């Protein structure tokens, strides 16, 4: 069996824990990715799509009224301004181009909040690929605008009713489909998790977030920020922000997991800090598990963070102490969501509001001149009905 070209592990995390039938597909994908990364024409086409279709580079906005502390500047990396409404579009364009390069005709994807599904649908429409999106039935119900968008762009949306009918079940169904169709289909995984080479591919196709941020900060402030802060579900927006700063040891990397109703309630999605290592979704990673080792249901107000595991590179960055991982509750995220809307006229995704909530908490504690950058990973249009129901007392 031919050897892998890239290291499938990040410390002890990662790997390729899949049925034997999928190993050739993953190796083929790794080969194609390595070749594409070295191919100037592929890179030129990807860069052109990011610039002229998706709208990169995205703005770095200094908030005027948000910071609770006059010594703290809070910048927002505006992935919410990207075509499609979230950071998801970046790596989806990269993977869809890669699929075309490999001669695949079909794309299979999973989605939670629907943002990855929308990004996949728009990339498939643009590049002439057939698109199937698996989505937990619960998420189909709570994200109807995104379901309509996907269907409008020609995607087939398949509700998944098994298990908890959320993202992890959609992941399982998508992987199952791919097992039988990989010769003609590419599985376009939506986060920096899953079996090798996906965590590496997704990081590389998201790393422009941090690269642009670094360049923009040096232009604006003449120095790097003290910390970059991003929400963590599977972890793609965060690893995209962190990747270019990992070697910049003066910059603190802070990931924010969803604490849901509170860590002590078990109604949360914070496996990095409160899970145990296990095998899930083709990788070795921290997992929410019960006392018998069964996967526990994760919970978050934001569908995109409602995931019982996390990408292996985040697990490694946590283990070696290079990044730290905090959490924010539903209530804190809701408060930050409203505060940003009222103070800056920007409505963030509920996912991004978790990162914002922690940034506000951190800003209050700072005792010297500090610059924080929050990755505003997506816009909040998709969440306005959820939030209005909660604020009007229609949900617990």
UniProtKB/Swiss-Prot annotation:
Metal-binding in keyword set: no
InterPro entries reported for this sequence: Trp_synth_b_CS, Trp_synth_beta, Trp_synth_beta/beta-like, TrpB-like_PALP, TrpB-like_PALP_sf
GO-annotated cellular components: cytoplasm
N6-(pyridoxal phosphate)lysine sites (modified residues): 88
GO MF terms held by the record: tryptophan synthase activity
Pfam families listed in its UniProt record: PALP
Transmembrane segment boundaries: none
Required co-factors: pyridoxal 5'-phosphate
Catalytic reaction annotation: (1S,2R)-1-C-(indol-3-yl)glycerol 3-phosphate + L-serine = D-glyceraldehyde 3-phosphate + L-tryptophan + H2O
Pathway in which the depicted protein is active: Amino-acid biosynthesis; L-tryptophan biosynthesis; L-tryptophan from chorismate: step 5/5
Cysteine disulfide links: none
The protein's Enzyme Commission number: 4.2.1.20
Record carries keyword Lyase: yes
Key words of the record: Amino-acid biosynthesis, Aromatic amino acid biosynthesis, Lyase, Pyridoxal phosphate, Tryptophan biosynthesis
Protein's job: The beta subunit is responsible for the synthesis of L-tryptophan from indole and L-serine.
Protein family membership: Belongs to the TrpB family.
Subunit structure: Tetramer of two alpha and two beta chains.
Protein name: Tryptophan synthase beta chain
Organism the protein comes from: Shewanella sp. (strain ANA-3)
Gene giving rise to this polypeptide: trpB
